[in-house]
From Swiss-Prot:
GO terms for cellular component: mitochondrial inner membrane; mitochondrion. This is Mitochondrial glycine transporter YMC1. The lineage of its organism: Eukaryota, Fungi, Dikarya, Ascomycota, Saccharomycotina. It comes from Saccharomyces cerevisiae (strain ATCC 204508 / S288c) (Baker's yeast). Solcar repeats lie at residues 26-106, 121-204, 218-305. Pfam families: Mito_carr.
Length: 307
């Protein structure tokens, strides 16, 4: 199998844009924001179920979590803490896609004298860079979201009255960036896989029909490619996400699982074996396809509208 694919920019050929094109960067970021909002609206119920499964202290199932959530909190419980990811994930996806596209332009211009294509390792490197940069924004946002998602009280009985109070308490306990290391590892390798798979699928589609342009690929195919890319991402990094979630729901003053990946992993394995690293895997995989299909389709369609 060839290691090189056509190097398609989102809408136009990469050659048409200089490496430092501010207008292109703004469009990338705006389209990424739209994709992130779509991801949250589609995926939030699955994500809430996943987080509660990952952090449950007793064995349970996805259906049991859903049943209890509906009984105790109603349908709105699935969207608890949504404001934070709606704003935050929009920013995170915007950053992921923006950096990924900037790196694609960087490699394209670097390769100009040798080849007009990007290699598979270069596509992977683009995604890794976007993921690592995004980690520093995603980690605190996810920490706040997870704290809000997992608190069972409401109103005056809630530990956190909202995102701002949650941020204040996390900062007071010097814990806002707890879980940053597993987030960097998850986002780096995960986004590398994510964008590599997507670009490979896009390139394969363009190779099948001579003269086909990226902007001519229908939305339903973009959804399928995004769904497959999102599924590949989570297959690669899921145990790291469990470790991160456990770290971010642990006691703020005296974390019983410890503050490192190794200490959390040892405790999880001691308490639940290998299965402990895959709690919530079902809802995550159910979420991966529609949420990431919506992300990529919205992203590309937004880019077409922006021109």
């Amino acid at each position: 199998m060839s290691e090189e694919f056509p190097s398609p920019q989102l809408i136009d050929d990469l050659e048409e844009h200089p490496q430092h094109d501010n207008a292109r960067v703004v469009k990338d970021l705006l389209a990424g924001t739209a994709g992130g909002i779509a991801q949250v609206l589609v995926g939030q119920p699955f994500d809430t179920t996943k987080v509660r499964l990952q952090t449950s202290s007793t064995p349970t199932t996805a259906m049991e979590v859903v049943r209890k959530l509906l009984a105790n909190e109603g349908p709105r419980g699935f969207y608890k803490g949504t404001l934070t990811p709606l704003i935050g994930v929009g920013a995170c996806v915007s950053l992921q896609f923006g950096v990924n596209e900037a790196m694609k332009r960087f490699f394209h211009h670097r390769n100009a004298d040798m080849s007009s294509t990007l290699s598979l390792p270069q596509y992977y490197a683009c995604g890794v860079t976007g993921g690592i940069v995004n980690s520093f924004l995603a980690s605190p946002i996810e920490h706040v979201r997870i704290r809000l998602q997992t608190q069972t009280g409401s109103g005056t009985n809630a530990e956190f009255k909202g995102p701002l109070e949650c941020i204040k308490k996390l900062r007071h306990n010097k814990a806002l960036l707890r879980g940053l290391t597993p987030t960097i590892l998850r986002e780096g390798h995960g986004c590398g896989t994510y964008f590599l798979v997507y670009e490979a699928l896009i390139a394969n589609q363009m190779n099948k029909r001579r003269g086909l342009e990226r902007k001519d690929i229908p939305a339903w195919k973009l959804c399928i490619f995004g769904a497959l890319s999102g599924t590949a991402l989570w297959l690669m990094v899921y145990p790291l996400d469990v470790i991160k979630s456990v770290m971010q729901t642990d006691n703020l003053q005296k974390p019983k699982f410890g503050n490192s990946i190794s200490s959390v992993a040892k405790t999880l394995y001691a308490n639940g074996g290998i299965g402990a690293f895959f709690k919530g895997f079902g809802p995550t995989m159910l979420r991966a396809a529609p949420a990431n299909g919506a992300t990529f389709a919205t992203f590309e369609l937004a880019m077409r509208l922006l021109g």
